[in-house]
Amino acid sequence: MERAPGSERRSPPGPGVPRPPPRGHAPSTAAPAPNPAPLSSSMQPDEERQPRISESGQFSDGFEDRGLLESSTRLKPHEAQNYRKKALWVSWLSIIVTLALAVAAFTVSVMRYSASAFGFAFDAILDVLSSAIVLWRYSNAAAVHSAHREYIACVILGVIFLLSSICIVVKAIHDLSTRLLPEVDDFLFSVSILSGILCSVLAVLKFMLGKVLTSRALITDGFNSLVGGVMGFSILLSAEVFKHNAAVWYLDGSIGVLIGLTIFAYGVKLLIDMVPRVRQTRHYEMFE
């Protein structure tokens, strides 16, 4: 049976045969898709550079948030333990030296009515206590990089600074109000020179170790030793000035007030900085 013309069944075009465009429309040529490789490669350096900038700006804060100091990335384990032992030796040396100087300075303060000598004696006691806190800080070998232990030591140092500064300022103001005149002799000179030199040397050692170990407690202990050295030389300065000009009797007490206020300001700054960090790192205790 023959089929009528036009009634043939048309098979759909195969996948390889393109469908002709409708009448009245020009054939559209598809534009080739852009290659995303150059774009991604051009953006990759910027994306890599941005994390590096942010990481460099918040490097130490990131490690402290995890309970570690920045020294954990700077020092190898054996290097950290070596510097920890050096910090312990310097702290023991500081305790012995400053304790002897404190006894001598208290003797000078009582015998010669020197407010600066009293202030130095109090600062020497503070140095003994701060060095003892540093001993506790580095007594545990496993806690050499512990941020929480570091901040606790700094908070204790801040409280001691406040108490000592109050005692120094009160004693100096009392001496100024009663017009106490310091006496000058060879013993006063010997104590002031010896204390100034020894405390300055201890301060340099503590600053160096504190920088390597990134320890705020060691740096604070070094600041305290530096104040002790300045007070030792101030005893010599005020005594020499009073020897040549008795009208400047207030220099000794004024130096005592100035040093006491300096210690007070440092203690307040230390507490403001460290108390929030103790709370932040209390869940990351790295010591037993």
From Swiss-Prot:
The modification Phosphoserine is found at S11, S54, S56, S60. It comes from the Eukaryota. The keyword Transmembrane applies. Gene3D superfamilies: Cation efflux protein transmembrane domain. Residues 109-115, 171-186, 238-254 are extracellular. Residues 1-87, 137-149, 208-216, 276-288 are cytoplasmic. It is a multi-pass membrane protein. Residues 25-42 have a biased composition (Low complexity). Coiled coil: none annotated. Zinc ion transporter that mediates zinc efflux and plays a crucial role in intracellular zinc homeostasis. Binds the divalent cations Zn(2+), Ni(2+), and to a minor extent Cu(2+). Is a functional modulator of P2X purinoceptors, including P2RX1, P2RX3, P2RX4 and P2RX7. Plays a role in central nervous system development and is required for myelination, and survival and proliferation of oligodendrocytes. Belongs to the TMEM163 family. Homodimer. Interacts with MCOLN1. Interacts with SLC30A1, SLC30A2, SLC30A3 and SLC30A4. This is Transmembrane protein 163.
